[in-house]
C-alpha cells in the first residue's frame, strides 16, 4: 500500500485551509440543506432543477471537505526557523530577473495546496518553483517550461 501524499505547506496556508473547512462544514452545509428542503417542497423530483442543482452542490462541497481533511491530515508544515533565510525554500519570497521578458518578478514559494499563480504564489512542485528551491542570491537557473526553457537570476531571497 502506498504512503499518503504529504502536502508541504506554510503555517499561513494551513490556517487558510482550516478556515475554509470550517466555513464549508458550518455555513455551506446548512445553506445547501435549506436549498434541498425548499426544492423538496416543490414536489416531483423528476423535473426539479433546483433539487438537482442543490444535490450537485452538496456533492461538490462534501468532496471538497474530504479533500481538505486529507490535505490537513497529511500536511507537512515548513518551520521557517529551521531553513536558512538566504536559501530558497517553501515560504520564501524570491525576486528574480526573468531573462526572457527582461523584467524582475517576485514569487512566493508555497506548497502545491496553496499555489495561486495569479498572486505570484507558485508551487514548490512547479517547474520554476522546483528550480528555485535550494538556490541563493546570484544563482542563475534554467527551467524547462511548456514553452521551452526559461532563464532566471535570483536577486533577493526573503521570508514571507
Curated annotation (Swiss-Prot):
Keywords: Coiled coil, DNA-binding, Transcription, Transcription regulation. Residues 12-76 form a coiled coil. It comes from the Bacteria. GO terms for biological process: DNA-templated transcription elongation; regulation of DNA-templated transcription elongation. SUPFAM superfamilies: FKBP-like (SSF54534), GreA transcript cleavage protein, N-terminal domain (SSF46557). InterPro entries: GreA/GreB_C_sf (IPR036953), TF_GreA/GreB_CS (IPR018151), Tscrpt_elong_fac_GreA (IPR006359), Tscrpt_elong_fac_GreA/B (IPR028624), Tscrpt_elong_fac_GreA/B_C (IPR001437), Tscrpt_elong_fac_GreA/B_fam (IPR023459), Tscrpt_elong_fac_GreA/B_N (IPR022691), Tscrpt_elong_fac_GreA/B_N_sf (IPR036805). PROSITE patterns: GREAB_1, GREAB_2. GO terms for molecular function: DNA binding; RNA polymerase binding. PANTHER family: TRANSCRIPTION ELONGATION FACTOR GREA. Necessary for efficient RNA polymerase transcription elongation past template-encoded arresting sites. The arresting sites in DNA have the property of trapping a certain fraction of elongating RNA polymerases that pass through, resulting in locked ternary complexes. Cleavage of the nascent transcript by cleavage factors such as GreA or GreB allows the resumption of elongation from the new 3'terminus. GreA releases sequences of 2 to 3 nucleotides. Belongs to the GreA/GreB family. This is Transcription elongation factor GreA. The gene is greA.
Amino acid at each position: 500500500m502506498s504512503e499518503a501524499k504529504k502536502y508541504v505547506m506554510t503555517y499561513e496556508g494551513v490556517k487558510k485551509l482550516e478556515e475554509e473547512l470550517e466555513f464549508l462544514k458550518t455555513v455551506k452545509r446548512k445553506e445547501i440543506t435549506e436549498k434541498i428542503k425548499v426544492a423538496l417542497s416543490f414536489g416531483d423530483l423528476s423535473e426539479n432543477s433546483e433539487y438537482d442543482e442543490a444535490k450537485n452542490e452538496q456533492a461538490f462541497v462534501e468532496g471538497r471537505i474530504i479533500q481538505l481533511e486529507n490535505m490537513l491530515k497529511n500536511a507537512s508544515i515548513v518551520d521557517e526557523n529551521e531553513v536558512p533565510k538566504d536559501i530558497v525554500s517553501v515560504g520564501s519570497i524570491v525576486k528574480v530577473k526573468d531573462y526572457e521578458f527582461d523584467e524582475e518578478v517576485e514569487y512566493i514559494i508555497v506548497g502545491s495546496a496553496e499555489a495561486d499563480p495569479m498572486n505570484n504564489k507558485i508551487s514548490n512542485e512547479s517547474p520554476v518553483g522546483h528550480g528555485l528551491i535550494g538556490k541563493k542570491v546570484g544563482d542563475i537557473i534554467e527551467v524547462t517550461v511548456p514553452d521551452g526553457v526559461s532563464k532566471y537570476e535570483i536577486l533577493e531571497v526573503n521570508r514571507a
